[in-house]
Amino acid sequence: QGVVWVGCLPKTACPPTSIDVTEMAKIAQHNPFYQEGQRIAKNHRGHAIVAVKGVSSAVERFRVLTKILAAVASSYNAVAIYQGASQLFYSRDFLLEQARLLQEGYLPVQAWIYFGFYSHENAFWCYTQGMGQFGREELEIASDRHTPRQLHEALIQFAYHYLSSHRQWNDGELVVLNEELSLIVHPRYSPTLKSDTLLLSFDS
């Protein structure tokens, strides 16, 4: 099974060519939308390493990375993409769909940011890991009235809005994302993520 490994970032040296398959399988297990991921990771047979250097802007660097990954994954006939530093493992088809969105002018945040889930005190939570790569706080959202998928979709929309702008929000500020979705922002320190975050709640 071919895997494209995103092995290094600007201003760093490329790592050895081996992959920790056990660690990769653990990361693959945490993608609930890629059911075949863990099996593919465990059966890994070969890989290509992709790195981007010399691009100063984080958003622009990830734009370039996505374009290169799509080209390599297509020509290399890869089945999955592994970004260990970002806790991401997803399918080739998913990458190509995200690259198509990029061509249409959208930021493919799901190919750049990890979105995780957990439950606590009768509520579902969704959170990000990877916003720090862009100099932004991580995001959290919680609700006892919405499904995990609804939380996921809301957080994706806010992450896209956050990376597309240079805005900073005050505590309690309302962010209108579209006619159907408005979120209230609460900056805080998250004991779960152990970092400063923006905790989001639904307006209604």
Give names to the regions the model predicted.
Residues 11-112:
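Internal, hydrophobic cores of structured domains that mediate oligomerization or house catalytic pockets
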Residues 84-204:
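Aromatic/basic-lined ligand-recognition segments
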Residues 1-23, 39-42, 167-180, 186-188:
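Long, low-complexity, Ser/Thr/Gly/Pro-rich intrinsically disordered segments that act as flexible linkers
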